[in-house]
């Protein structure tokens, strides 16, 4: 699949927030092997490829299949490098690379959702638009956010919110979700969180 020209430009022109810090800490030199565990739109890849100066290997990893056009654009621009895109969870891919004897001089991880997910409302990561609860990094996966919200127990939901979201009101939010189910859209989930948070804050000041 080819990127429309405007997306090609966005892929190449995307600038990471901590670009200078990443380059300074990794200190990439020509001839090295770089493993980018969260390739995304290729913003970090462009910076580090420039430091390789046409000599080296760049291994890109991402579980989101929609990154492929961005990788192909990157590959065309930096054709003198040895490049490879591996799809999957970076923890599993890194284990596979180690098993195959691949040694990296630098490994980069930029964790969290990216503009590739947030800028596409239909994927369900943004709360700015009322859309179905999806939130799958890999859209070929069967389990969606709606499945978890509607099928998990109250205790499981509270644990998810506490462990992965560091949510102060994890338990009351989980309790209200269970009482309001089914929830199918982002606005429904946002409403539950907002109402619960407001109630808990109000209760704390009584």
Question: Which residue ranges define each predicted feature?
Answer:
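S-adenosyl-L-methionine-dependent methyltransferase catalytic core, i.e., the SAM/SAH-binding region
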Residues: 1-203
């Amino acid at each position: 699949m080819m990127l429309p020209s405007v997306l090609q430009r966005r892929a190449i022109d995307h600038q990471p927030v901590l670009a200078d810090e990443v380059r300074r800490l990794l200190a990439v030199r020509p001839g090295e092997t770089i493993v980018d565990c969260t390739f995304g739109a290729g913003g970090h890849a462009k910076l580090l490829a420039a430091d390789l100066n046409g000599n080296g290997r760049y291994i890109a990893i991402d579980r989101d299949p929609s990154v492929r056009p961005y990788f192909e654009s990157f590959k065309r621009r930096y054709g003198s490098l040895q490049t490879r895109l591996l799809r999957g969870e970076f923890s599993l891919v890194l284990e596979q690379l180690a098993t195959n004897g691949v040694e990296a001089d630098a490994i980069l991880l930029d964790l969290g959702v990216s503009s590739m997910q947030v800028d596409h409302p239909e994927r369900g990561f943004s709360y700015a638009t009322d859309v179905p609860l999806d939130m799958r990094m890999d859209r070929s996966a069967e389990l969606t956010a709606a499945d978890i919200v509607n099928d998990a127990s109250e205790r499981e939901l509270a644990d998810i919110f506490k462990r992965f979201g560091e949510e102060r009101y994890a338990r009351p939010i989980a309790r209200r979700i269970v009482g309001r189910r089914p929830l199918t859209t982002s606005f429904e989930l946002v409403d539950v969180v907002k109402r619960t948070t407001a109630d808990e804050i109000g209760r704390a000041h009584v």
